[in-house]
C-alpha cells in the first residue's frame, strides 16, 4: 500500500506498511504458532485476509486546529496535530464527508478542543459507514452541550450536502483525558441505528456499541464460526461478550437455543432487533456481565462461544468453564497473548482448530478463531 503520509514521516500508525501482505501474514502466523507452541494443535487453517487499503468502515478523528481551519486526524505525542483525511485505509466515500465537515465546523462555531489549554468544545468526529447501503453514522464528541443549539441550527446544511448521513448524534465527554466518548448520547436524527448486513444476516450499529472495523474480514470471521458450529452436534449454545450479536446470529438455527450476553445495553438492543428480523424466537440477548452470568447458571450448553476484549476472559471465567465443562468452546480473540494465557487455564480442553484473520493489515495485530474440544 502506498501512503503519502507515511512516506513524508507524518504518520507511523501502519508500522508494517513497507512489508508485502504475504510477509505480514507469515510474521503473524509465526507469532501465533509461537504463542501456542506448548499446545498440540490438530489443524492449522490457512489465514484469511482482505483488501490492503480502503477497508475501514470507521474513522476516529481528533479535531484540532482552529474553528476556521479545523484539522481532522490525530495528535502526535508532543501535541502536534496531523490531518489524516487522506489516509488510504479509509474508503473513497469518506473524502466528501471530511470535505463537507470542515466548513460545517466553522458554520456551527464548533471550536476544536485544545488539549494544552483545556479550552474549546469539539473533541472528536466519529464516522461509520454501512457496507450494505452506504448509509453513515456521524458522531460529534463535545466537551459540553454549550454549542448544541448552534449545531442543531446549522445541521440542515450538512444533511443537504451529505444525504448519506442516516444517524447523527452528539456525545458529551466532559473529562480532560484521552477518552473517546462519554456516557451521554444525544440523537439529532430520528433514525438511531445504522443497518448493516453480513452474509445475509441483518446487523445494527448503534453509537455506543462495538462493531468490527474491517467488514470484509469480519464477515469471513462470522461465516467461519457459523461453518464450524454447523459441523458440531449443537442444540444449545452461549455467546458471551456477544456485542451486537454477530457470532450468535450467524451460528443460530431455528431449533437451537442460544443466549447472548454483553454488558453494553446499546449492543444488546441491536442484537434483539436482528433476532426479531430473522424470526429466531429461541434466541435471548441480555445486557449482563458475561462472567457473572455464566457462573450463575445451572444448566450447561454444548457450546460456549467467547469473544472477549483484549484482556481475555480471565481466570474466574476459565475456572468456571473448566468446572461446567461444555463439550466445545469457540474462542474468538483480538489478542492471541491473552487467549494463550486463558487456554493454559483450561487444561481439560485440546485445540482442534485454529485460524488467523488479518483484520488489521500493516500492523502486528490480528484476530484468531480457535475451536477447543473437551478431552
From Swiss-Prot:
- Catalyzed reactions: uridine(747) in 23S rRNA + S-adenosyl-L-methionine = 5-methyluridine(747) in 23S rRNA + S-adenosyl-L-homocysteine + H(+)
Kindly list the positions annotated as binding [4Fe-4S] cluster: 3, 11, 14, 87
Would you kindly state one Gene Ontology biological process term found in this protein's UniProt entry?
Answer: rRNA base methylation
Q: Which residues are annotated as active site? A: 334 (nucleophile)
Assigned EC number? 2.1.1.189
InterPro entries listed in its UniProt record = 23SrRNA_MeTrfase_RlmC, MeTrfase_TrmA_AS, MeTrfase_TrmA_CS, SAM-dependent_MTases_sf, U5_MeTrfase_fam
> What Gene Ontology molecular function terms does this protein carry?
4 iron, 4 sulfur cluster binding; iron ion binding; rRNA (uridine-C5-)-methyltransferase activity
Keywords linked to the UniProt accession: 4Fe-4S, Iron, Iron-sulfur, Metal-binding, Methyltransferase, rRNA processing, S-adenosyl-L-methionine, Transferase
**Does the keyword field hold Iron?**
yes
Quote the record's binding site residues for S-adenosyl-L-methionine: 212, 241, 262, 307
Q: Which NCBIfam families match?
A: meth_trns_rumB
What is the similarity comment for this entry? Belongs to the class I-like SAM-binding methyltransferase superfamily. RNA M5U methyltransferase family. RlmC subfamily.
Q: What does this protein do?
A: Catalyzes the formation of 5-methyl-uridine at position 747 (m5U747) in 23S rRNA.
Name of the molecule in the record: 23S rRNA (uracil(747)-C(5))-methyltransferase RlmC
**Annotated source species:** Escherichia coli O7:K1 (strain IAI39 / ExPEC)
The organism's lineage is: Bacteria, Pseudomonadati, Pseudomonadota, Gammaproteobacteria, Enterobacterales
Q: Which gene encodes it?
A: rlmC
